[in-house]
Amino acid sequence: QQIQRTGEALTTAGVLEAATAADYAVNLVQVEHPASNDLREAVYRLSHQAIDGLVVVQAGRAGREQLVLPPSMPVAVSDSTLVDYYPSASADQVGGVRDAVGHLLELGHRTVHHVCGPEDSQSSLIRRATWARTLREAGREVPEPVPGDWEAAAGYEAGLRLAPDPEVTAVFCANDELALGLIRAMHEQGRRVPSDVSVVGFDGLAVGEYSFPPLTTVRQDFKRHGHEMVDLVLEQAASGPLDGSRSIIIPTELLVRGSTAPPTP
Protein backbone atom coordinates (compact mmCIF):
# COMPACT_ATOMS: atom_id res chain seq x y z
CA GLN A 1 0.00 0.00 0.00
CA GLN A 2 0.98 3.67 -0.25
CA ILE A 3 -0.14 5.37 2.94
CA GLN A 4 0.21 8.91 1.53
CA ARG A 5 -2.80 8.24 -0.72
CA THR A 6 -5.99 9.36 0.99
CA GLY A 7 -8.08 6.25 0.35
CA GLU A 8 -5.40 3.84 1.49
CA ALA A 9 -4.70 5.98 4.57
CA LEU A 10 -8.37 6.00 5.60
CA THR A 11 -8.70 2.24 5.03
CA THR A 12 -5.53 1.66 7.05
CA ALA A 13 -7.02 3.71 9.88
CA GLY A 14 -9.98 1.32 9.83
CA VAL A 15 -7.61 -1.67 9.96
CA LEU A 16 -5.78 -0.18 12.95
CA GLU A 17 -9.03 0.57 14.77
CA ALA A 18 -10.47 -2.92 14.28
CA ALA A 19 -7.21 -4.69 15.13
CA THR A 20 -6.71 -2.62 18.28
CA ALA A 21 -10.28 -3.34 19.37
CA ALA A 22 -9.50 -7.06 19.02
CA ASP A 23 -6.32 -6.60 21.09
CA TYR A 24 -3.90 -7.06 18.18
CA ALA A 25 -0.91 -4.90 17.30
CA VAL A 26 -0.32 -3.92 13.66
CA ASN A 27 2.95 -3.78 11.73
CA LEU A 28 2.68 -1.47 8.70
CA VAL A 29 4.74 -2.06 5.57
CA GLN A 30 4.52 0.34 2.64
CA VAL A 31 5.07 -1.22 -0.79
CA GLU A 32 5.93 1.30 -3.50
CA HIS A 33 5.46 -0.98 -6.52
CA PRO A 34 3.21 -3.99 -5.71
CA ALA A 35 3.48 -5.54 -9.19
CA SER A 36 7.28 -5.72 -8.87
CA ASN A 37 9.18 -7.87 -6.38
CA ASP A 38 8.49 -5.29 -3.64
CA LEU A 39 5.31 -7.04 -2.49
CA ARG A 40 6.90 -10.49 -2.59
CA GLU A 41 9.85 -9.28 -0.49
CA ALA A 42 7.60 -7.49 2.02
CA VAL A 43 5.44 -10.59 2.49
CA TYR A 44 8.55 -12.76 2.87
CA ARG A 45 9.89 -10.50 5.63
CA LEU A 46 6.57 -10.38 7.45
CA SER A 47 5.95 -14.12 7.19
CA HIS A 48 9.20 -14.78 9.04
CA GLN A 49 8.05 -12.66 11.95
CA ALA A 50 5.59 -13.71 14.64
CA ILE A 51 2.46 -12.46 12.88
CA ASP A 52 -1.05 -13.89 13.14
CA GLY A 53 -2.39 -12.67 9.80
CA LEU A 54 -1.93 -10.37 6.83
CA VAL A 55 -4.11 -7.55 5.46
CA VAL A 56 -3.23 -6.25 1.99
CA VAL A 57 -4.91 -2.87 1.65
CA GLN A 58 -3.78 -2.19 -1.92
CA ALA A 59 -1.89 -4.42 -4.34
CA GLY A 60 -2.82 -2.84 -7.67
CA ARG A 61 -2.17 -5.17 -10.58
CA ALA A 62 0.07 -7.54 -8.62
CA GLY A 63 -0.30 -11.18 -9.63
CA ARG A 64 -0.84 -14.14 -7.35
CA GLU A 65 2.83 -15.03 -7.68
CA GLN A 66 3.67 -11.81 -5.81
CA LEU A 67 1.80 -12.96 -2.69
CA VAL A 68 3.51 -16.18 -1.63
CA LEU A 69 2.27 -17.09 1.85
CA PRO A 70 3.08 -19.80 4.38
CA PRO A 71 0.40 -22.53 4.50
CA SER A 72 -2.70 -21.53 6.48
CA MET A 73 -1.61 -17.90 6.91
CA PRO A 74 -4.82 -15.86 7.44
CA VAL A 75 -5.01 -13.18 4.77
CA ALA A 76 -7.48 -10.62 3.41
CA VAL A 77 -7.01 -8.49 0.30
CA SER A 78 -8.78 -5.57 -1.32
CA ASP A 79 -9.30 -3.79 -4.66
CA SER A 80 -6.70 -5.66 -6.68
CA THR A 81 -6.38 -8.62 -9.02
CA LEU A 82 -5.73 -10.70 -5.89
CA VAL A 83 -9.45 -10.68 -5.02
CA ASP A 84 -9.85 -13.63 -7.39
CA TYR A 85 -7.65 -15.82 -5.17
CA TYR A 86 -8.00 -14.73 -1.54
CA PRO A 87 -10.79 -13.67 0.85
CA SER A 88 -11.49 -10.02 0.11
CA ALA A 89 -13.43 -6.90 1.01
CA SER A 90 -13.99 -4.26 -1.67
CA ALA A 91 -16.19 -1.26 -2.36
CA ASP A 92 -18.96 -1.68 -4.91
CA GLN A 93 -16.98 0.03 -7.65
CA VAL A 94 -19.40 -0.98 -10.40
CA GLY A 95 -22.52 0.17 -8.58
CA GLY A 96 -20.89 3.44 -7.58
CA VAL A 97 -19.81 4.31 -11.11
CA ARG A 98 -23.22 3.39 -12.51
CA ASP A 99 -24.82 5.74 -9.97
CA ALA A 100 -22.46 8.58 -10.91
CA VAL A 101 -22.83 8.25 -14.68
CA GLY A 102 -26.56 7.56 -14.42
CA HIS A 103 -27.04 10.71 -12.35
CA LEU A 104 -25.39 12.84 -15.04
CA LEU A 105 -27.40 11.23 -17.83
CA GLU A 106 -30.65 11.66 -15.89
CA LEU A 107 -29.87 15.38 -15.60
CA GLY A 108 -29.97 15.53 -19.40
CA HIS A 109 -26.31 15.44 -20.43
CA ARG A 110 -25.79 13.78 -23.82
CA THR A 111 -22.65 11.98 -22.68
CA VAL A 112 -20.11 11.96 -19.85
CA HIS A 113 -16.36 12.47 -20.15
CA HIS A 114 -13.98 10.65 -17.81
CA VAL A 115 -10.69 11.50 -16.12
CA CYS A 116 -8.98 8.21 -15.24
CA GLY A 117 -6.94 7.08 -12.29
CA PRO A 118 -3.56 5.36 -12.76
CA GLU A 119 -3.12 2.38 -15.07
CA ASP A 120 -1.62 0.25 -12.29
CA SER A 121 -4.76 0.50 -10.12
CA GLN A 122 -7.43 -2.18 -10.37
CA SER A 123 -10.00 0.25 -8.94
CA SER A 124 -9.14 2.77 -11.65
CA LEU A 125 -9.50 0.19 -14.40
CA ILE A 126 -12.86 -1.00 -13.07
CA ARG A 127 -14.16 2.57 -12.87
CA ARG A 128 -13.07 3.33 -16.42
CA ALA A 129 -14.54 0.12 -17.83
CA THR A 130 -17.83 0.62 -15.98
CA TRP A 131 -18.08 4.26 -17.13
CA ALA A 132 -17.69 3.18 -20.77
CA ARG A 133 -20.07 0.22 -20.41
CA THR A 134 -22.75 2.37 -18.75
CA LEU A 135 -22.61 4.88 -21.61
CA ARG A 136 -22.77 2.15 -24.26
CA GLU A 137 -25.74 0.50 -22.56
CA ALA A 138 -27.52 3.87 -22.59
CA GLY A 139 -26.80 4.26 -26.30
CA ARG A 140 -24.49 7.23 -25.75
CA GLU A 141 -21.20 8.20 -27.34
CA VAL A 142 -18.15 7.09 -25.33
CA PRO A 143 -15.60 9.94 -25.41
CA GLU A 144 -11.86 9.32 -25.30
CA PRO A 145 -10.93 9.03 -21.61
CA VAL A 146 -8.41 11.52 -20.25
CA PRO A 147 -5.42 9.85 -18.55
CA GLY A 148 -4.61 10.82 -14.97
CA ASP A 149 -3.58 9.47 -11.58
CA TRP A 150 -5.00 10.05 -8.10
CA GLU A 151 -3.65 13.60 -7.66
CA ALA A 152 -5.42 16.97 -7.91
CA ALA A 153 -2.67 18.21 -10.24
CA ALA A 154 -3.66 15.60 -12.83
CA GLY A 155 -7.27 16.72 -12.54
CA TYR A 156 -6.20 20.31 -13.10
CA GLU A 157 -4.29 19.34 -16.26
CA ALA A 158 -7.30 17.35 -17.46
CA GLY A 159 -9.50 20.37 -16.86
CA LEU A 160 -7.23 22.57 -18.98
CA ARG A 161 -7.47 19.96 -21.74
CA LEU A 162 -11.27 19.62 -21.60
CA ALA A 163 -12.30 23.22 -20.90
CA PRO A 164 -11.95 24.58 -24.48
CA ASP A 165 -14.43 22.02 -25.85
CA PRO A 166 -18.01 23.36 -25.54
CA GLU A 167 -19.31 19.80 -26.07
CA VAL A 168 -17.92 18.85 -22.64
CA THR A 169 -20.84 19.38 -20.25
CA ALA A 170 -20.35 16.50 -17.78
CA VAL A 171 -17.22 14.88 -16.33
CA PHE A 172 -16.89 11.85 -14.06
CA CYS A 173 -13.51 11.81 -12.29
CA ALA A 174 -12.00 8.62 -10.89
CA ASN A 175 -11.57 10.22 -7.46
CA ASP A 176 -12.40 13.39 -5.57
CA GLU A 177 -8.93 14.89 -5.77
CA LEU A 178 -9.00 14.72 -9.56
CA ALA A 179 -12.43 16.35 -9.50
CA LEU A 180 -11.29 19.22 -7.30
CA GLY A 181 -8.31 19.93 -9.55
CA LEU A 182 -10.54 19.79 -12.62
CA ILE A 183 -13.07 22.22 -11.10
CA ARG A 184 -10.33 24.78 -10.46
CA ALA A 185 -9.12 24.54 -14.06
CA MET A 186 -12.67 24.92 -15.37
CA HIS A 187 -13.21 28.07 -13.32
CA GLU A 188 -9.89 29.54 -14.48
CA GLN A 189 -10.84 28.89 -18.09
CA GLY A 190 -14.22 30.57 -17.72
CA ARG A 191 -16.31 27.37 -17.56
CA ARG A 192 -18.74 27.58 -14.65
CA VAL A 193 -19.44 24.52 -12.49
CA PRO A 194 -22.20 23.37 -12.63
CA SER A 195 -23.82 25.88 -15.03
CA ASP A 196 -21.48 24.98 -17.92
CA VAL A 197 -19.94 21.71 -16.72
CA SER A 198 -21.19 19.19 -14.16
CA VAL A 199 -18.53 17.27 -12.22
CA VAL A 200 -18.78 14.08 -10.15
CA GLY A 201 -15.98 12.57 -8.07
CA PHE A 202 -15.51 9.24 -6.31
CA ASP A 203 -14.53 8.54 -2.66
CA GLY A 204 -16.65 10.94 -0.61
CA LEU A 205 -13.75 12.74 1.06
CA ALA A 206 -14.78 15.28 3.70
CA VAL A 207 -13.03 18.12 1.85
CA GLY A 208 -15.49 17.79 -1.04
CA GLU A 209 -18.32 19.08 1.12
CA TYR A 210 -16.45 22.37 1.53
CA SER A 211 -15.22 22.89 -2.04
CA PHE A 212 -16.83 25.50 -4.29
CA PRO A 213 -19.26 24.32 -5.36
CA PRO A 214 -19.69 21.38 -2.96
CA LEU A 215 -18.70 18.23 -4.83
CA THR A 216 -21.19 15.60 -5.95
CA THR A 217 -19.42 12.30 -5.32
CA VAL A 218 -19.71 8.58 -4.67
CA ARG A 219 -18.91 7.87 -1.04
CA GLN A 220 -16.88 4.83 -0.01
CA ASP A 221 -16.97 3.63 3.59
CA PHE A 222 -13.22 3.37 4.12
CA LYS A 223 -13.48 2.63 7.84
CA ARG A 224 -15.84 -0.30 7.26
CA HIS A 225 -13.50 -1.48 4.51
CA GLY A 226 -10.66 -1.79 7.01
CA HIS A 227 -12.90 -3.40 9.62
CA GLU A 228 -14.16 -6.06 7.20
CA MET A 229 -10.64 -7.11 6.21
CA VAL A 230 -9.57 -7.48 9.82
CA ASP A 231 -12.72 -9.52 10.53
CA LEU A 232 -11.84 -11.85 7.64
CA VAL A 233 -8.35 -12.40 9.06
CA LEU A 234 -9.66 -12.99 12.58
CA GLU A 235 -12.26 -15.46 11.30
CA GLN A 236 -9.51 -17.48 9.61
CA ALA A 237 -7.31 -17.33 12.70
CA ALA A 238 -10.16 -18.75 14.77
CA SER A 239 -11.71 -21.26 12.36
CA GLY A 240 -9.21 -22.04 9.63
CA PRO A 241 -8.80 -20.98 5.98
CA LEU A 242 -11.69 -19.47 4.04
CA ASP A 243 -12.52 -20.15 0.43
CA GLY A 244 -10.67 -17.77 -1.87
CA SER A 245 -13.97 -16.83 -3.46
CA ARG A 246 -15.22 -15.30 -0.17
CA SER A 247 -15.86 -11.68 -1.14
CA ILE A 248 -17.51 -8.89 0.84
CA ILE A 249 -18.85 -6.07 -1.33
CA ILE A 250 -19.35 -2.83 0.58
CA PRO A 251 -22.12 -0.56 -0.76
CA THR A 252 -21.32 2.95 -1.97
CA GLU A 253 -23.57 6.01 -1.79
CA LEU A 254 -24.12 8.81 -4.31
CA LEU A 255 -23.97 12.19 -2.54
CA VAL A 256 -25.63 14.80 -4.76
CA ARG A 257 -24.33 18.28 -3.96
CA GLY A 258 -23.72 21.48 -5.87
CA SER A 259 -21.33 20.46 -8.66
CA THR A 260 -23.99 18.85 -10.88
CA ALA A 261 -26.98 20.36 -12.69
CA PRO A 262 -28.90 19.97 -15.95
CA PRO A 263 -27.01 21.27 -18.99
CA THR A 264 -27.66 24.87 -19.99
CA PRO A 265 -30.00 24.96 -23.02
How would you describe each model-predicted region?
Residues Q1-L10, L28-N37, G60, A89-D99, ...:
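Hinge/beta->alpha junction and helix N-cap segments in small-molecule ligand-binding domains
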Residues Q1-G102:
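Alpha-helical recognition/docking segments in bacterial nutrient-uptake
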Residues D52, R110-V112, V168-T169:
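Short acidic/polar active-site loop segments enriched in Thr and Asp
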Residues V101-V112:
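Glycine-rich phosphate/diphosphate-binding loops that line cofactor/substrate pockets in enzymes
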